């Protein structure tokens, strides 16, 4: 077995239960996607599997060497590229040996990995990270470069088990294609969290995490969606039938009460005409009321049962919340000049090389709509920071009008 999850639960510090009683076995070499609504605990589950978080109860086991690519990298700021890749100690030992220090501890640390530098440079080149120093701080890389670095480490380490949390985030087209190819050909056990349908369709099994636990489907994402739709339609039909039955039960109970009231009124009038003594009339009335009460209780129990079944069905229906973004119209008139850039360029403190071989010149006006596209590390985020004033160009000038932004 490669991944075993047994009776696993996790509770937030505010006592809110995120998930409970999770059980799952992923056999060696299997490739599985973990899906579910935002906030259901997918990332927390992978962090527990990676040993970066502790469960409330239960246990997890991952066989062999495990490699984890997180969704966010802030916790690694302050580390160098070599430290992130986990090769800094080996490199130190290698350089010490090459410089004549033959202490036994260096050989033990290197562990006969004499071509560690060559292998590292090869995977960095494959992930379009050639030219990046192994001593460069992680925070000096773009979001896409950070993702590529962790994925390069995945190839460098050749692990038995891979945990990938949103690995296509920040990746450009070329980076995504390389990831798809790697996932397709690797023999490692793979567990992936992603919203990338192309990646999800490469995986032959889907496990959905929800408030009801883990439900697994034998098939890729398209198959999973089809099965979910069939299941949802069946639940919806059951719900409609139960709601119809509830309306009928309430109508029947109401009609019975009305009919009983009319019968009681007619019975009392008839008894008075026949001269039945009041004491006997009271007994007959009590008997009728008891019978009516028992019948009402039967109908009430039936109605309550149907209502509970409806509640359970509604709870079983998958959530279909959809993201909707509505930007209010700008108060600025169309065509107002917001940003004017003249021959701007930028380089970070740890580099003397400009981001762009040709300086950028452009003008932004209110009402314009632009899409900034480019490879990872081409400077898209840096350009936005220059536009908003978060960064200052190291060359050229940029002028900004007073405007708000998100």
Predicted features along the sequence, with ranges:
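ABC-family P-loop ATPase nucleotide-binding domains
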Residues: 75-140
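Conserved hydrophobic segment flanking the Walker A/P-loop of ABC-type ATPase nucleotide-binding domains
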Residues: 26-28, 348, 356, 362-366
């Amino acid at each position: 077995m490669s991944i075993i999850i047994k009776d696993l639960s996790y509770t937030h510090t505010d006592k809110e239960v995120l998930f409970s009683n999770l059980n799952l076995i992923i056999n060696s070499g299997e490739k599985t996607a973990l899906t579910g609504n935002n906030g259901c605990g997918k990332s927390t589950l992978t962090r527990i599997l990676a040993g970066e978080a502790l469960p409330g109860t239960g246990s997890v086991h991952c066989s062999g060497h495990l490699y984890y690519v997180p969704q966010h990298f802030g916790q690694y700021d302050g580390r160098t590229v070599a430290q992130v890749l986990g090769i800094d100690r080996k490199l130190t030992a290698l350089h010490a040996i090459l410089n004549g220090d033959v202490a036994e501890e260096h050989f033990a640390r290197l562990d006969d990995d004499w071509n560690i530098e060559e292998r590292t440079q090869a995977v960095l080149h494959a992930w379009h990270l050639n030219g990046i120093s192994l001593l460069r701080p992680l925070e000096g890389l773009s979001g896409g470069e950070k993702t590529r670095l962790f994925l390069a480490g995945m190839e460098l380490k050749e692990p038995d088990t891979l945990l990938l949390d949103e690995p296509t985030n920040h990746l450009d087209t070329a980076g995504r294609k390389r990831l798809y190819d790697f996932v397709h050909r690797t023999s490692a056990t793979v567990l992936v969290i992603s919203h990338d349908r192309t990646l999800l369709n490469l995986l032959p099994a889907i496990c959905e995490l929800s408030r009801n636990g883990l439900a697994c489907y034998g098939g890729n994402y398209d198959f999973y969606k089809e099965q979910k739709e069939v299941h949802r339609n069946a639940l919806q039909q059951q719900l409609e039938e139960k709601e119809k039955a509830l309306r009928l039960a309430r109508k029947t109970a109401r009609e019975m009460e009305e009919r009983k009231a009319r019968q009681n009124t007619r019975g009392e009038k008839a008894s008075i005409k026949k001269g039945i003594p009041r004491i006997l009339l009271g007994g007959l009335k009590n008997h009728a009321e008891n019978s009516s009460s028992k019948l009402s209780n039967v109908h009430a129990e039936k109605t309550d049962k149907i209502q509970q079944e409806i509640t359970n069905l509604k709870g079983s229906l998958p959530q279909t919340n959809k993201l909707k973004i509505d930007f209010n119209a700008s108060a600025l008139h169309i065509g107002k000049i917001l940003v004017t850039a003249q021959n701007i360029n930028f380089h970070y403190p740890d580099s003397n090389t400009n981001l762009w071989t040709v300086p950028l010149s452009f003008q932004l006006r209110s009402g314009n709509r632009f899409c900034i596209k480019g490879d990872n590390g081409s400077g898209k985020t840096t350009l936005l920071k220059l536009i908003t004033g978060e960064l200052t160009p190291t060359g050229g000038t940029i002028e900004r009008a007073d405007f708000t932004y998100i």
